[in-house]
């Protein structure tokens, strides 16, 4: 069911995932998966995946992992896409976030 889909996404957040794959895990068609998931979680499976990726990215940035590494480890195609998406969701750039929350010395 939907719980299995969530577990799959949490474990494989860095991989490319399709609705067909997720439907297979849940035993539902793409359409029914999308409806059921959104009804239960309040967000789409893709938004859920993005949320997991950004949460992981925040942890890595706090550990001073370079942005390009963070982007690649969290499933983004490149640093540019990661930076734009991070800023849109969090409100600051990854660099600003790392400066604020990372373990850097001033």
Specify the residue positions occupied by each region the protein language model found:
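Short hydrophobic/aromatic patch on the recognition helix
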Residues: 32-33, 37, 81-82, 86
């Amino acid at each position: 069911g939907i719980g299995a889909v969530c577990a799959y996404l949490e474990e494989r957040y860095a991989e490319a995932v399709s609705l067909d794959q997720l439907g297979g895990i849940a035993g539902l068609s793409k359409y029914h998966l999308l409806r059921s998931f959104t009804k239960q979680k309040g967000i789409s499976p893709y938004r859920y995946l993005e949320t997991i990726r950004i949460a992981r990215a925040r942890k890595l940035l706090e550990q001073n992992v370079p942005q390009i590494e963070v982007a690649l480890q969290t499933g983004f195609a490149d640093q540019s896409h990661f930076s734009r998406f991070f800023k849109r969701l969090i409100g600051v750039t990854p660099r600003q976030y790392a400066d604020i929350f990372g373990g850097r010395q001033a």
